[in-house]
């Protein structure tokens, strides 16, 4: 009986491996927070944000500071992200209906050069 269970388990594992084969091939290309270019971009953006708020590392590590400094104005957001007129208009429209804000930390994680960056799409309010 245990041999049958083992064979069933092995067969099921092979089926599951087949289902994720495309992911296993693509995963080497998927950026993570551990990639050097991502770390450098984060540090650069963090430094820019700290300078804007005239803050220090201890502020950055304080969640109260993060909440108090959340960005909810287009004029401040434009200091960190290049927004075209259509994007500004979309943010203004969203802002008329919904409250929005992005914390300094979350902003530092966004690839501001990639408008299709998942964090950009989740954080910057547009239709």
Segment roles from a protein language model:
Residues 1-127:
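Flexible, acidic/Gly-rich N-terminal and inter-domain linker regions that tether
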């Amino acid at each position: 009986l245990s041999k049958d269970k083992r064979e069933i388990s092995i067969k099921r594992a092979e089926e599951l491996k087949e289902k994720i084969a495309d992911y296993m091939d693509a995963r080497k290309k998927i950026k993570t927070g551990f990639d050097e270019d991502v770390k450098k971009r984060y540090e650069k953006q963090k430094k820019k944000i700290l300078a804007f708020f005239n803050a220090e590392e201890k502020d950055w590590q304080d969640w109260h500071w993060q909440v108090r400094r959340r960005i909810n104005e287009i004029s401040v957001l434009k200091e960190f992200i290049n927004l075209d007129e259509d994007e500004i208009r979309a943010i203004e429209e969203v802002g008329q209906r919904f409250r929005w804000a992005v914390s300094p930390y979350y902003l530092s994680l966004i690839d501001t050069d990639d408008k299709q960056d998942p964090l950009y799409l989740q954080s910057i309010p547009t239709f």
